Each structure stands twice: as structure tokens, then as C-alpha cells.
């Protein structure tokens, strides 16, 4: 809840700061306000005057008495209207950007698992589509990365907004896209390799720029995300999908590409508390669309039948 609560707290800080600023101006102008009989003007009456003016309450129990006080009051009332209009227009823009971001992240559950991984995306998408269809898929993620960079650089608070499921996040999705693109650049061929380069470029651009905005220097992973045995499995997937011949000489190229983005992903993961998975999924991970909280709550004594090994590994 840090993202939404911090945004609300920011609005409160802005409003309180402006009210106190105009309070000080009224106090410096001599507290020239009309009060009820037997009441003396002072700092607290100026604060009340400033609050009612900023939120345009118009109660009429306190009014400015001098020309300077009237000018300050009019200016504060206009600024209060502008502040409310800014808040009203700001929230829908934030929600629209958040909603567009989450659409593709939700689609990843069926396409790359939850949490997403490069090997699952290759197994589920690349093995079941022709190279042209997979190229279109990468093109969609290129556009998503560009929109992510534009919206999150303009509104950095969106970086703290969580996805609907705790095993999904925009950072994990972006890292998965970079993993797949790096694989195709290192081992791929033809037009698909060119599209992978374009997707990798904008995705890394977004990752690095957001790291700079959030002041998170790159950090190396303490644990290897891609052990040699998993790399061998990925090469086998690429060959099975007819996307590459996977020459082992390209392993160095993949390592160079990984060094271009993994340290930034690690830094953002630590800063935002958003875990990043490995290149291959953890064993016995079930997609979100196959689970239900109601089943776990309503059947305390009845355990669901275990999935067969084929059902665990197959998408549908």
C-alpha cells in the first residue's frame, strides 16, 4: 500500500504546506482580519482564515480587513481552486497509466507463468507460434516498455504501485522481456533477431532511466540467475522452436547483454521490494488462473487432487 498511501500523503503535505505559507503571509501583514467580538487576531486565527480560504469554505465568520489581507485571500482562494483541480485531474491520469501497465502483466500469467520467466515464455509462446507471430508478440512488448518508460518517468510514484497478484510485478515482467530479447539477440536469426534488438533497446532504456530517477545504483546479483544447466535447456528450447541453431560461441554474447541490464534490475528489486525470478521457473509453480482462494478457504478438510506431472508443466 506504500504507493497509493504515499500519493495521498503527498497531497496532504502540499495542502498543509500551502495553508501554513499563507498563514505566515497573513501574520506578517499584521493579522488584519475581522473576528467575532472579544476575540483578538493572531497566528491561530490567521491559520483558520487560511484554511477556510484555501478550501473555499466561505463561512464568513472571519474576513480580511486591509487591502493586503484581501489580496492574499483572493490569491489563496484561486490557488486552492487550482490545487483541487490538479488533484481531480491527476488521479485519473495515474490510474489510466497504471491500468494500461497491468493489462500486459496479467497476460503474462498464461504466457510466461507467475512469476514470469524466459524459459516459460519460450516454451508456451515460441513453441506454439510461428516466428512471425512471436515477432508480433515482441513488438507488443516493445510498445509496452515505451509506454512504461513514458508514464513512470513522468509519474515516478507509479513505480511503487503493486500488481494485483503478489507474484507479479512490472519489474519482473520487464526483466523477463529483457531475458527473452537477450536470448534471441545472442542466438536468434533473421527478422526475429532484429525485433528482439528493438525490444531489448527500449526495455533496457526504461530500466536504466527508472533506476536513475529512483537513485538506485546498479548492483550485481548474489546468486547466479542462469546456471549452466538451465542455459543448456534454453538453447534446446530455441532449437525446438526453430528460432536458432544455438552455437555455443554465442554464450559470451549473452553474458555481455545480461551485464547491460541485470545489475539495474537487481537494484530496483531491492529498492522496490519486488522479487525477480530466475530464467527458469521454480518447481511446481501453478499459474494464477489455475488457482482460487475460495477453494482453499471452503475446503479445509478436503485437499485438492494433486496435479500430474504433465498438468504441472503444460499450460492448458
Predicted feature locations:
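Acidic, Ser/Thr-rich low-complexity segments on the non-lumenal side of membrane proteins
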Residues: 119-152, 162
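Pore domain of cation channels
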Residues: 11-14, 22-23, 36-103, 179
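Soluble C-terminal extramembrane regulatory/interaction domains of multi-pass membrane proteins
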Residues: 112, 116, 130, 137-140, ...
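C-terminal TM-helix exit segments that contain a strictly Trp-centered aromatic cap at the helix terminus
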Residues: 20-31
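Generic, well-ordered alpha-helical scaffold segments in large soluble proteins
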Residues: 81, 94, 144-147, 180, ...
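Membrane-proximal helical linkers
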Residues: 95-128, 136
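Cytosolic juxtamembrane amphipathic/interface segments immediately preceding
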Residues: 1-7, 61
Amino acid at each position: 500500500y506504500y504507493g497509493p498511501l504515499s500519493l495521498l500523503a503527498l497531497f496532504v503535505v502540499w495542502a498543509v504546506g500551502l495553508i501554513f505559507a499563507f498563514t505566515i503571509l497573513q501574520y506578517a501583514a499584521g493579522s488584519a482580519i475581522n473576528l467575532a467580538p472579544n476575540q483578538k487576531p493572531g497566528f491561530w486565527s490567521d491559520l483558520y482564515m487560511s484554511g477556510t480560504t484555501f478550501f473555499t469554505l466561505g463561512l464568513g465568520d472571519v474576513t480580511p480587513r486591509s487591502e493586503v489581507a484581501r489580496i492574499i485571500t483572493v490569491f489563496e482562494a484561486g490557488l486552492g481552486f487550482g490545487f483541487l483541480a490538479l488533484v481531480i485531474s491527476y488521479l485519473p491520469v495515474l490510474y489510466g497509466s497504471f491500468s494500461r501497465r497491468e493489462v500486459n502483466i496479467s497476460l503474462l500469467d498464461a504466457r510466461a507463468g507467475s512469476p514470469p520467466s524466459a524459459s516459460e515464455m519460450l516454451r508456451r509462446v515460441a513453441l506454439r507460434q510461428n516466428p512471425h507471430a512471436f515477432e508480433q508478440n515482441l513488438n507488443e512488448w516493445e510498445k509496452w516498455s515505451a509506454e512504461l518508460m513514458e508514464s513512470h518517468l513522468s509519474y515516478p510514484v507509479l513505480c511503487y504501485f503493486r500488481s494485483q497478484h503478489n507474484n507479479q510485478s512490472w519489474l519482473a515482467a520487464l526483466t523477463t522481456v529483457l531475458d527473452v530479447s537477450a536470448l534471441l539477440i545472442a542466438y536468434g536469426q533473421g527478422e526475429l533477431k532484429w525485433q528482439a534488438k528493438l525490444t531489448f533497446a527500449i526495455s533496457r532504456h526504461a530500466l536504466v532511466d527508472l533506476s536513475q530517477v529512483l537513485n538506485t545504483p546498479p548492483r550485481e546479483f548474489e546468486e547466479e540467475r542462469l546456471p549452466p544447466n538451465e542455459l543448456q535447456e534454453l538453447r534446446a528450447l530455441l532449437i525446438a522452436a526453430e528460432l536458432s541453431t544455438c552455437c555455443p560461441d554465442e554464450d559470451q554474447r549473452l553474458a555481455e547483454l545480461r551485464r547491460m541490464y541485470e545489475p539495474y534490475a537487481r537494484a530496483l528489486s531491492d529498492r522496490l521490494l519486488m522479487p525477480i525470478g530466475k530464467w527458469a521457473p521454480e518447481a511446481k509453480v501453478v499459474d494464477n488462473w489455475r488457482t482460487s482462494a475460495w477453494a482453499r478457504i471452503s475446503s479445509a478438510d478436503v485437499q485438492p487432487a494433486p496435479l500430474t506431472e504433465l498438468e504441472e508443466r503444460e499450460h492448458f
